[in-house]
Amino acid sequence: MKSTDTTGDSSLRLELNVPNCVTALRVVLAAIIGYLLYQREPGALFAAGILLIVAASTDTLDGILSRRLGQETPGGALFDLVADELLFMPSLILAIVAGLFARTDGLMPLNPYLYAVPALAGGVSVLAGVAVFLRKRRTRVFDFPSPPPVAKANYWFWMAPLIVAVLGVGPDSFLAVLMYLALISTILTFYAYLKKGSYVFTD
């Protein structure tokens, strides 16, 4: 467990700055995307797919801005993690309910759950980790584990099949390959987080 002092950068206060505003935009877009996916109409699904690309891109943009503007904060990092899951998890569930992964039936066993269940479990684990961290930090100060390199790529491995399924583009086999790659990436990311950040749950 890494301990830090209680001053300066260790504060979890969510500051009103440009990167956090970009992250907040992702949360707003997540709500709009959820509404569009719920409609299940071709035009709404196309708009949802485009907005998914835009919203997912803000995950990269807010990170770049926070580094270049010198506005990296622990609170902003946690907000970014939560915003990622607020975008991905409801969108994936609504896409499954809408039958957008049905075209890979026969190409993936237990379609689409072999892809979806581990991905959703990963998202739940992240949110649980944030909740436990915030609870424990009331009595002592320690760092939340920074995402391992594989986790940064993993988010796009999660999003790629979702975007392709929502837009309905590409061959069915291409979507299936993306889903298998997402499964592999999820397993590797879970192991990396378990190895690096298990102290959040155990200490």
Where are these regions (language model features)?
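Short hydrophobic/aromatic, small-residue-rich stretches within specific transmembrane helices
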Residues: 48-56
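Juxtamembrane helix-boundary/capping and inter-helix hinge elements in multi-pass membrane proteins
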Residues: 70-74, 139
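Active-site phosphate-binding strand-loop segment of PLP-dependent enzymes
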Residues: 32
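Short, hydrophobic transmembrane alpha-helix segments
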Residues: 35-43
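Membrane-interface alpha-helices at helix entry/exit sites of multi-pass transporters
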Residues: 76-79
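A feature for the membrane-embedded catalytic helix bundles of lipid/isoprenoid biosynthetic enzymes
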Residues: 2-20, 27-29, 81-203
